[in-house]
């Protein structure tokens, strides 16, 4: 869920989402063998030109499926584009990668908004690609994405055609 803290129009780089892309299956988010949290538009057959801008006034809420191909367009204005992002998941959707930075099950449970703590993670027959090996320069998701040479959102831009 995103909440715009500023008015967001097509000039100051709105969140862009490709409708229906969450139904295409797992997309590789690796660059040169390492997880980077972004996809290469040249290697990924996706209708990037179909990305829809999510514009709105400050206070607008945006929602999209976590597997939807999404990203922010370049901010081509002098206006800021602050966005508060909040993720929600089921109480039984444990991090398969384990807890990080010394976190424990108690820390995980403290985040429960609705539901009950469980020691039985839900495992469904869905494709999952683990984020291994970790990025060479592990940092924020935005830092990790910088290792990908071909990025549609934020570099190649929604107004530029991706060519193979």
Each language-model region and where it sits:
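Non-heme Fe(II)/2-oxoglutarate
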Residues: 68-164
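Double-stranded beta-helix
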Residues: 8-73, 93
């Amino acid at each position: 869920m995103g909440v715009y803290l500023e008015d967001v129009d097509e000039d100051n780089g709105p969140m862009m989402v490709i409708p229906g892309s969450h139904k295409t299956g797992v997309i590789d988010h690796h660059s040169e063998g390492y997880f980077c949290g972004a996809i290469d538009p040249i290697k990924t057959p996706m209708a990037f030109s179909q990305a829809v801008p999510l514009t709105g006034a400050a206070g607008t809420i945006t929602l999209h499926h976590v597997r939807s191909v999404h990203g922010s367009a370049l901010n081509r204005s002098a206006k800021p584009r602050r966005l508060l992002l909040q993720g929600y998941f089921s109480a039984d959707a444990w991090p398969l990668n384990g807890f990080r930075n010394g976190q424990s099950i108690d820390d995980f449970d403290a985040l429960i908004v609705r539901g009950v703590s469980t020691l039985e993670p839900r495992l469904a027959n869905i494709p999952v690609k683990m984020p291994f090996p970790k990025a060479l320069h592990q940092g924020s998701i935005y830092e990790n994405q910088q290792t990908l040479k071909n990025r549609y959102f934020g570099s190649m831009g929604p107004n530029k055609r991706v060519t193979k």
